[in-house]
Every structure is written in C-alpha cells, then in structure tokens.
Amino acid sequence: MRIVVATAIALVLAVPLNLAIEAFARQAFAVPPEFEPFQGTVAPYTAGGVVLAGAAFAVLRRVVRDAARVYVRVALGALVLSWIPDVALLVIHDPGATVPGVASLMAMHTLTAAIAVTSLTRIAR
C-alpha cells in the first residue's frame, strides 16, 4: 500500500510541475508548436512514467534485499536512457526540435525521476 501512496504523491507533484515546465518553455524559449513532445502528451507520459517507476520499485522490493539502494541505480540508468530519444530529436532534425525545447524535455525527465525516486525510497521503504 505504501508503494501506491508514494506513486500517487509522485504523480500529484510531477504532472503539474512538468506542465509548468512545458508552459514556461513555450513562452520563454518560443518552442515551436510542431514540437511533438509538447503536443498534449506531457501529462499522460509523465503519469505513465511515474506508474512504471512505482511498478519497478515494487518488483525490486520483492527480489532484492535493499530495494531503495538498487532502485536509485536503476532509476539513474533509466533517466540516462530516457535522454537518448530527446537528443535524437535534434540529431534527426525533428520538426520543431530546438535545443531549448529538448533541454526542457530532459529537465522534465530529470524532475520526474527525482520526485519518483524521493517519494518511493522515503515513503515506500
């Protein structure tokens, strides 16, 4: 039950903060409207990522002795992997992809990971 609570807390924090980052990026950096990651997918993708984070923590709690320590490493690896498609948007010259837009997307991933890791490792231990 504590994993569910920790995941819910992470959801309640991460989704609005990522939407705020998106809004800020659109205004401050003039991220083009054709930038696909900002076309209505921020909230559902953030929610999906947080739910997957909670599921991963639940699995680790069942299979390893120190789930929190292992989870931090797994989450860090997942975060680094999540940046690969972000950078790829620039490499493949995706329509609307700009350095500030991609950096904002990477910041969202980082913020979500930090919130999920903190919530899961402190509340769901």
How should each PLM-predicted stretch be described?
Residues 2-15, 110-125:
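Membrane-water interface at the C-terminal end of transmembrane alpha helices
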Residues 9-10, 44-49, 104:
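Alpha-helical transmembrane segments of multi-pass integral membrane proteins
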Residues 15-16, 77-88:
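Aromatic-anchored segments of alpha-helical transmembrane domains
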Residues 15-39:
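Hydrophobic transmembrane helix segments
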Residues 47-63:
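Canonical alpha-helical transmembrane segments
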Residues 86-103:
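Membrane-helix boundary connector in multi-pass membrane proteins
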